[in-house]
Amino acid sequence: AKVSEGASVSSINRENQDYDPLVRAALIHYQFETIHPFLDGNGRIGRLLILLYLMEQGLLKEPVIYVSYFLKKNQVEYYDRISEVRRSGNYEQWVKFFLEAVDSAASDAVESIEKLSKLHEKNIALLPKPKRKKDNLRMLFDYLEKHPIIDIKHTSETLKISYNTTSTAVKTLVELGILRETTNAARNRVFSYEAYLEILRNGT
């Protein structure tokens, strides 16, 4: 692949249709890092661009892989690979490195999903069987898997259950060891699903 200095994302995508979308993503990321269009935040935006492009190409439905972790972990080699393209025009070594980053990120994502699934099954088994048809405790638990940091007021409003009912459910999850209070305050207390967050933090 040959990329001109002023090439845009759309032109790279258009001119390299014979290449796999992952290869095009590598070329786009390299070009963005070369142009550095912003005064600040180019690295973060460049890494975000990888995810957005893979989603736009239909390779991802959700942003579930974190390529940034591999790039940060191998930062010296990352910059060396980009510099080598600028120095010699050798895109192949850069594309190979980029594909290694995507492969590593995908493996990490699969591992995290498996851990989250096991955590889900483990904690579901801890929940007492509901005494009523409407299972507020299960509703709160399901909510936690999308919002692992909560406060009682906002959660009760979102789930459309009373403050006292939400407070009781939160207390139960704290007693079961699923939730943990992080504020140690009398009012406006915040609780976190620490085991869930720890899995998400790992590898980021």
Where are these regions (language model features)?
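Short acidic, hydrophobic short linear motifs in intrinsically disordered regions
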Residues: L137, F141, K146-L159
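Phosphate/pyrophosphate-binding active-site loops
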Residues: A1-E114
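Conserved, hydrophobic alpha-helical core segments of structured domains
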Residues: Q17, V23, K131-L140, Y163, ...
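Basic amphipathic alpha-helical segments that dock to polyanions
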Residues: L144, T166-L176, F191
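Conserved alpha/beta core segments of nucleic-acid transaction machinery
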Residues: A101-R132, N136
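Short, cationic-aromatic polyanion-contact patches
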Residues: K133-K134, E181-T204
